[in-house]
Each structure stands twice: as structure tokens, then as C-alpha cells.
Amino acid sequence: MDSLTIPPVDLRLLAPLLVVVTWATVLLLVDVFFIPDGRKKLTGYLAIGGLVVAGLVGLPLWGVTGTTFGGMLRLDPFALTLTWIFLLIGILSITMSLDYLPGQGIEQGEYYPLIMFAVSGMILLAQGTDLIVLFLGIETLSITLYILTGFAYPRLTSEEAAMKYLVLGAFAAGFFVYGIALIFGATGSTRLGEIGAYAASRGIGDLNLTLLLGGAAMVLIAFSFKVALAPFHMWTPDVYEGSPTPVAAFMSVGTKGGALAALVRLLFEGLPTLNEYWLPVLAGLTALTMVVGNLGAVAQTNVKRMLAYSSIGHAGYVMLGVMVAGEQRGPEAFLFYMLVYALSNLGAFAVLIALEHQGENAWRLDDFAGLYQRQPLLAVAMAIFMFSLAGVPPMAGFMAKFYALTAAWEGGLPWLALVGVVTSAIAAFFYLRVIIRMFMTEPEGEPTPTLNRGLTVDIALAAIGTIAIGLIPAPVFALVERSLVVLGG
């Protein structure tokens, strides 16, 4: 009888993840027993501290490559770079929530640990090299977001958004599990490396190939829902509009980042030899996503819904890098785009929160009328974010789109790069429309927005980062290049 073998475990490789999970768990207890109502901001500050500590413990791990838990989790510079991006997203999202929650009358201490648990799910997706781990990561992220989406209870729009997200998310989870079952039935493994080796072998039969392709299709459908690729995007505008604005901001970048990180692993390590099957499908979904997202945004007069459709379009641009993951430039474009998009989009949502303090209807395009005369610095910051999201030089968004389009062109998808160029031109219309309202329209009696300390820090960091990366992109380029030296090794 074979003895039970315990796989080797190197917890050092999981240091940032363990810090986030442990800190969030302890913080839940501390909040319940030691932090009274009315002082829940302290829980938020402690959560920010935990995310900062998680980032710091990752610094000595730069350049370290290894697997743990029997090869189910992998630390490499790619995963570590994404971990730092995810921690930054969590910090900025919590910072913009500190005054928003009490202002809306929904301040609850568990909000901040939930954000931390969501970040832990994103980190798990970046490090996972096993389909079971990827499922755990995406469900950890999703379940926390179901709760956070309905956090504005008893506001009906928030409850409706949470219910829609929960039902459709459960549907996507079913696809994921069924896909894992088919892939395991075809290959006998859930490890991405072993799946890739089996798919590359000449001994794979027609039946197993059919099962493998069917399972891969199921998993890709699940990821498409999480990323909001068309036609799996229909939930996005309603869920973003009904969610508390900081939650919508977090979802717009966090869900995409985590799911696409796992998708890069899956395509690059698990299915590289089957790209003749999945590449045309993903290319079609990407083109449709860019078209639907940007055309949908043009028709919006609600800026929050416009940013939701904008996030759909940007999912298509990020996919340009993901699809050519077999080429060095593809994952580089993905990492660079995720960082730039996170800064620009979180900054834009922070401006929305500054206006939202004046009432529930502060998302209309008319609410931006004459903003430059009422709050000049806020208008300038929003203009920076809009120019960046539109891809206008010298903002960082221009370099990100250029990098992604170049990756698609050099990766053998020139037609898709051209679709990206055309849809970027369409996108410029609705971004510039916001800028025109702020600078070239007279105020119509709207109150002057007030900026609290948290929002000021968020907006300032995002604006400075957007400009700095646009003007001096070389250091960030160097970082992402070093992050991919050992990807898939």
C-alpha cells in the first residue's frame, strides 16, 4: 500500500497572500470586538496598513521563482508584479471609501476586510497554476463582490445589482466547474503544465481532443463573463450603476486584472499548442467587445454607466495582449495596460465620488457642467483621466494602447489592431464630451464639490501616476520586461 505523500510547501513564496488573508481575518475580529460604531474609519486605515505590509514583504521575493503546494501555486516576477498592482488597487479603493461610506449612511466595518479578501482572490489567480486553484481564486473574488455590490442596502438599485451579479456569476461558475471536469476527463490532470504537455503530445486521440476543447471552451466562457467580454457583458452597466461607487471602481479594474492574469497562465502554459482553435474565437470576442463597449458608451448620458461601457471596451484592448501571450510583447502589454488602466479608471471614479457627495443624481453628464469654474483642480484631474482613457498623448493611456495595438500587430493579428484603432477613435467622442462639459459649459446651479482627504490623495496619486508614466514610461517598461523573463518556465 502506497504511503500518503505530503507535497512540499514553501510558505515564503506565499508571503504577500498570507499577510492579506491573515490580516483580513484578524481585522474582522478586531472590528467586531474593539472598534465601536462611528469609528469604522479606523478599520479602513488598518486595512490599508495590511495591504502596505503585504507589498513590503514581497520586496525580498523579487527575482525569486518557485512552486509550492505540489506545483499548484507559482511565484515568479509576473505574479509578484501583478500582486503589487492588485494591492495598489485595493489601497486606492479603500482610500476612496473612507468618507464615502459614512456619507451614504452605509458605514460597516466588514467592508474593508471584504476588500482585502477580494484582493487575496486576485493574488491567488495570479499565482495559480492549477485549475482548482484558479476556481478558488475567482470564487473568492466573486463572492466578496456579491456582498459588496449589495452593500448599499436598502437601496433597491444596489440589491438589484447584487442579485443580477449573483445569479449570472453562479451561472458562470457552473461553466467553470463543468469545464474543469471535461479537461480532467481528457487529460487526467488539472495542472496547467501537465495539461499543456498532454495537449502537445502526439498520442492525444480525437475523443480526448474533443473533451479538452469542450472543457477549454467552458472555462473561457466563465472568464469572458468575469472580464465582461461581449456578448457576456450585459450585466456590467446595471451592476456598476447599482453598486456603491467605490465598489464599482474596484470591480472595473480588479475583476479584469485577476481573471485576465489567470487567462494568461491558462493560454500560455496550458493551451499553447491549441491556439489554432482558441485564437480565432478570442479574436472575434475581442473585436466584438471593443465595438460594443465603445458604441454603448457613446449613447450614455449617465457618466457612471458610460464608465461601465468604457470598461467593456478596455477589456478588449487588454485582451490584445492576452491573446498573443505566446509572444514576449503580449504579456508585457497586458501588465503595462493593467497598471495604467487601474490608475486612470480609479481616478475617474474618485472624481465621480466627489460629485456624488452632493446627491444621488450626480452621475449625469449635466452635473459636470462648468466644473472647471466650480472646482478647477478637480476638473483638470478628470480631464487627465479622460485623455488617458481615450489614449491621447502624452498621457499614459496612449502608451498603453500603443503597446497593446503593437503587440496585436506583431503577433499576427493586424486586422484586430485596426479594429482597436477605429474603436479608439469612437471612444474619444464620449471622453471628450465630458471634458467639453467641464471646461466649455456654464454651471447650471450645481453645488461646488468638496474634496476630503482620502479623495484628494486618491485623485492626486492617480493623476500624477498617469502623467508620469506617460512622460517617462521607460522604468515601467523595464519592470514589465523583467517580470516576464521566467513566465512559463
From Swiss-Prot:
InterPro entries: NADH-Q_OxRdtase_suN/2, ND/Mrp_TM. It is a multi-pass membrane protein. Coiled coil: none annotated. This is NADH-quinone oxidoreductase subunit N. Its EC number is 7.1.1.-. NCBIfam families: NDH_I_N. Pfam families: Proton_antipo_M (PF00361). The chain crosses the membrane at residues 15-35, 44-64, 78-98, 106-126, 131-151, 166-186, 209-229, 244-264, 278-298, 306-326, 333-353, 378-398, 412-432, 459-479. The gene is nuoN. GO terms for cellular component: plasma membrane. The keyword Cell membrane applies.
